[in-house]
Amino acid sequence: MSFSVTLPDGSKKDFDKAVSVKELASSIATSLGKAAVGAKINGVMKPLDYIVDEDVEAAIITDKDEEGLDILRATAAFLLEAVAKRKYPELRLGMHEADEGGFFVDTDKEDQIKVTELPDLEKAMQKAIKNGEKIEYTSMKKSELEEIFKDDQFKLDLLKDEEDEVAVYKLGDFVDFGFDALLPNTGKIKNFKLLSVAGAYWLGKSSNPMLQRIFGTAFFKKAALDEDLKRRAEIKERDHRTIGRDLDLFFVDPKVGAGLPYWMPKGATIRRVVERYIVDKEVADGYEHVYTPVLMNVDAYKTSGHWAHYRDDMFPPMDMGDGEMLELRPMNCPSHIQIYKHHIRSYRELPIRIAELGMMHRYEKSGALSGLQRVREMTLNDGHTFVALDQIREEFAKVLKLIMDVYKDFDITDYYFRLSYRDPKNTDKYYANDEMWETSQSMLKAAMDDLGLDYVEAEGEAAFYGPKLDIQTKTALGNDETMSTIQLDFMLPERFGLTYVGQDGEEHRPVMIHRGIVGTMERFIAYLTEIYKGAFPTWLAPVQAEIIPVNEEAHGEYADKVRAELAKRGFRAEVDHRNEKLGYKIRESQTQKVPYTLVLGDEEMNANGVNVRRYGTEEQISKSLDDFIAEIDADVKSYSREK
């Protein structure tokens, strides 16, 4: 026997007998053999015990590599399965996965595993880690595994996709499959944490049983684990779902409709302020705001192409019984096209800018729903401009300037530009007109080049009817998210027969520019909630000033007078008339992250003044009511956090 192993640098090592991955690593360098945790053999992850006995390409994986962390986390998931099965013999195991976020294991138990049981599972894992229990890598016939798991439908489902010979891992009597590479023993899984338990449908289908998904993470170094747990705690504090509950901004009740948020008065106030701001900005920029129905005849979506390309994301149509089929709109563009078509248009009117805070409905699977970020009913800050061909670049620059102005007011600074094209290898899901795609993509690129802006290009991210500029922001939780979009569309004007009368008296086809400045109200307010951590700047805060009388009987009437003065000038203020201790009320105001807390006692009442405490500070300053009104007025008008 003789064979060669090709290494990443192109060099080769020759062998005359079979070697394990660990032996291969040691033959390259003794230190590499000690650091190795696995290898990529012909691009596939393999464990240290894997035997190499033929010509292959090999890359050794160490604990310094990302793939090494995947191997560690997969091993932690395997160990969690083993100890959970020991602790709960009746337990059935489903999917498992390890990635850059950590690992998870799906479990099925009649008496569901609760988060309070995680410490006991951790202790069982730590005991196995301390003992350095051996993890055996071997293979078994698929038929053997089917016999072992004959009473476990979950495992039988997973075995359907396996070959006749299946790689398996054993820890004592425990056996499982579906792992690429694991460590040879439990000793290195020292720095791990079980994080949470959540529901997950088997194979991701809502018609299947709901399992309990246990999440965890693991690192080679304790410092890395500590840093990750600190980051996760920060994320939890910033999670808009948590803040929304604590500040009473919104709620979602699956019993009355998953993905359908209810806006409480405070959340509705924030949304209303944002909506008014957006409308004022757009009107000042030449847009005409409209209202259009949320229902539309299905034929409109057949004409637009949504029915063919977007139907899976739409709710089923409503049969009105007289041949009419109505559809909840998933997008606003066909509605704005009807506004354009309602009159004969002249070149003198162009560009025609139409905008709407348009309510839409999209069918999202229940497993994808999340707070305000993924919902089934949403209100989009939508706009469409109809232009002549020679107006595209100027209008594109104008829209981009409007977006940048809005970003400045909200102090959005962490973003980049992405030009999103169709996938040339998978054109079936896009409007079939190669010339249109080439023209619109080159025009979009030229418009960005004219402005001297840096951008990345992404194939496969375009809408089915045209390429677009996506402005990608980084959320407070570290996720990449599309905030704004500008899109060139030659298709819909063609499909709906849109025209304008040109200077020559002939009919011409306009180009349609789709644009969204801040996306949906739901997602944007989720973004703001997390960025501000619930401590909204004064202009956005649902309650701008909390007024607390020291003694209700003595100072309650004066507190109402102060609130009335503030309300008269357009400021949002509340009086805390509850029969609670003063210190409790002040702490509550801070907990609710109200920008200004005003405490009113004898001194303030006699001087027609207020005692002011800014959120996040201990300092209390007495001043006249007029001076405070001037202060809060300047604060509200400053908009940006930087100002």
UniProtKB/Swiss-Prot annotation:
Q: Where is the TGS domain?
A: 1-62
Subcellular location as annotated: Cytoplasm
Its required cofactor(s), as named, are:
Zn(2+)
Pfam families, A to Z: HGTP_anticodon (PF03129), TGS (PF02824), tRNA-synt_2b (PF00587), tRNA_SAD (PF07973)
Amino acids binding Zn(2+): C333, H384, H514
List, alphabetically, the PROSITE patterns matched: AA_TRNA_LIGASE_II, TGS
CDD domains, sorted: TGS_ThrRS (cd01667), ThrRS_anticodon (cd00860), ThrRS_core (cd00771)
Query: Annotated region Catalytic: where?
Result: 239-537
Please provide one cellular component term from the Gene Ontology annotations of this protein: cytoplasm
Query: Which GO biological process annotations does it have?
Result: threonyl-tRNA aminoacylation
Catalytic activity from the UniProt record: tRNA(Thr) + L-threonine + ATP = L-threonyl-tRNA(Thr) + AMP + diphosphate + H(+)
Q: Which GO terms describe its molecular function?
A: ATP binding; catalytic activity, acting on a protein; metal ion binding; threonine-tRNA ligase activity; transferase activity; tRNA binding
Cofactor binding comment, as recorded = Binds 1 zinc ion per subunit.
Q: Which UniProt keywords apply?
A: Aminoacyl-tRNA synthetase, ATP-binding, Cytoplasm, Ligase, Metal-binding, Nucleotide-binding, Protein biosynthesis, RNA-binding, tRNA-binding, Zinc
Extract the InterPro entries matched here.
aa-tRNA-synt_IIb, aa-tRNA-synth_II, aa-tRNA-synth_II/BPL/LPL, Anticodon-bd, Anticodon-bd_dom_sf, Beta-grasp_dom_sf, TGS, TGS-like
Q: What is its main location?
A: cytoplasm
EC number assigned by the record: 6.1.1.3
Domain of life from the UniProt record: Bacteria
SUPFAM superfamilies, A to Z = Class II aaRS ABD-related, Class II aaRS and biotin synthetases, TGS-like, ThrRS/AlaRS common domain
The family assignment reads: Belongs to the class-II aminoacyl-tRNA synthetase family.
What is the documented function of this protein? Catalyzes the attachment of threonine to tRNA(Thr) in a two-step reaction: L-threonine is first activated by ATP to form Thr-AMP and then transferred to the acceptor end of tRNA(Thr). Also edits incorrectly charged L-seryl-tRNA(Thr).
Kindly state the subunit structure of this protein.
Answer: Homodimer.
Q: What is this protein called?
A: Threonine--tRNA ligase
Look up and give the organism this protein is from.
Answer: Lactobacillus johnsonii (strain CNCM I-12250 / La1 / NCC 533)
**What gene name does this entry carry?**
thrS
